[in-house]
Amino acid sequence: MKEFDLESYDYHLPKELIANYPILPKEKAKLLIYERHSQKITHTTFEHVLDFFPKNTLVVLNDTKVIKARLFGSKYAFLPSKTTEVFFHRFLKNNTALTQIKGKIKVGDKIFFDENHYAEVLELLNNGQRLIAFYDNKTPLDQASILKLLEQYGHMPLPPYIKRADESLDTLEYQSVFAKHIGAVAAPTASLHFSQNTLENLLKDFKHTFLTLHVGAGTFASVETKDIREHQIHTEVLHIPKKSQEILQKSQEILCIGTTALRSVEYFKRLKTPKQEAFECDIFLHLANPIQHANYLLTNFHLPKSSLLMLVSAMIGLEKTKEIYQIAIEKKYRFYSYGDGMLIL
């Protein structure tokens, strides 16, 4: 069936529609609204986004905070040039970290960030990932110290389709105004559309709750299995406080700010009797595993053959998704992380 064929999720996007910078002020970004019941499409801007939110819905937001996850170092402490890139993914046990390192590397190699701070390669894992530990003068660093090191020397992890180096504006703009709990290596991009003013109006006028899904590097990975049902999606750390769990369990209608919030809601609501607040979220939503609990979605326009495009198709159907994306292309909407948005009602 074509809805499970990977090639069905391909489309051509003119390069000039890939957003390399955010629209400022945020309210000026374009917004496509699709109402499923009437099949009506409205073109507006984020200045009016809250006017379209159903009044009695629960709005769910992901308050993860992006780490400055890209580090540059050298293999020798005395070398001034920093040409080896370390992309931090997540912490593992005993303060070790899962990373990607560009270039040839072997177990035991050290990568220096200054005269004292360095990382040592502990293990070469499958799929190109590297297990490393961080040190200060041979003393292992704990997680808090590693995060300080990343904040001091790291760069914002802009997506691979943004073909430029990160700039000072990205520290502010590639982070939602409600980002709180550090741990993501990619922004939950629908959240980037909210200015402080829009957020305050949302919190004042709508029922809402927060959860934390630390977006992983796997969010950019394309699906590669010919049958999308065979794809193994990445795992991400999810934290839902007890108060938020109670609100989610009671709510009938849910509007998710972004695919990360939606995946979190779907994962949590399918658990029988969750007793903890921390989870490993690995839910892959597509037409064979459709959305059951979330009712509405605010999202950006996603990459061809991506799991996020399949999630949107699970909500409105493959043909309607392709039709709307073609309209967005014709109307010169800006795509991907810094791009325009779409509200599915």
Curated annotation (Swiss-Prot):
GO CC aspect terms: cytoplasm
Q: A GO biological process this protein is involved in? A: queuosine biosynthetic process
List all disulphide bridges recorded for this chain. none
Pfam families to which the protein is assigned, alphabetical: Queuosine_synth
The Swiss-Prot or TrEMBL record annotates one GO molecular function as: S-adenosylmethionine:tRNA ribosyltransferase-isomerase activity
Q: Which UniProt keywords apply?
A: Cytoplasm, Queuosine biosynthesis, S-adenosyl-L-methionine, Transferase
Tell me where it resides.
Answer: Cytoplasm
Q: In which pathway does it act?
A: tRNA modification; tRNA-queuosine biosynthesis
Q: Which InterPro entries match?
A: QueA (IPR003699), QueA_dom1 (IPR042118), QueA_dom2 (IPR042119), QueA_sf (IPR036100)
Which reactions does this protein catalyse? Answer: 7-aminomethyl-7-carbaguanosine(34) in tRNA + S-adenosyl-L-methionine = epoxyqueuosine(34) in tRNA + adenine + L-methionine + 2 H(+)
Describe its function: Transfers and isomerizes the ribose moiety from AdoMet to the 7-aminomethyl group of 7-deazaguanine (preQ1-tRNA) to give epoxyqueuosine (oQ-tRNA).
Complex formation: Monomer.
Alphabetized NCBIfam families for the sequence? PRK00147.1 (NF001140), queA (TIGR00113)
Instruction: Identify its protein family.
Output: Belongs to the QueA family.
Recorded protein name is: S-adenosylmethionine:tRNA ribosyltransferase-isomerase
Q: What is the lineage of its organism?
A: Bacteria, Pseudomonadati, Campylobacterota, Epsilonproteobacteria, Campylobacterales
